[in-house]
Amino acid sequence: GFGIFDKKAKKFEWRREFEGFTLKYPIRALFCASDGTIWMATDGDGLVHLDPATDRSERYTTENGLTSDAIISVHEDIEGRIWFTTEEGLFWLDPERRTIISANDLLGIEGSIFNPNAAWLHPDGHLSFGTSQGILTFNPAELDYFNKVDIKLILNDLSLNYNSITADPE
């Protein structure tokens, strides 16, 4: 579960019940994001996002595209993307798009076992994650995924059911 201490009321509340789900597994890591929301890496309930200001919560699991519901660590980069590790590698979530993307191929990660709650954001924007093979450090801004070039698409021909379709010249 998750404990919350209300300073004004001087009360401690232990929570396992969230909006639409109940935590059944321990929390491995907590991270307070720059927007004041809390990210919880659980041992089998996926990645949980809680907004303490509104008490709204959401959960990312294998049903949303995760490769595992066992999240090992979680951290945020300087662009607000949430990075987390599972038994299957390193991933990030773009909070605006709610899209989960694997960083394994981009970083050449193979067979690394990530350590619980072992993530760090360096002042220069680099992220580090502790693994069984040492420390993995990289700068998310330098990944090819984020350095997209606008490409103009030109179609010479388009076929629909083996029939060529011509575009209006304008």
Predicted feature locations:
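Residue-level "micro-hotspots" composed of small/polar
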Residues: 5, 19-31, 43-45, 50, ...
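Catalytic-site microenvironment of enzymes
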Residues: 54
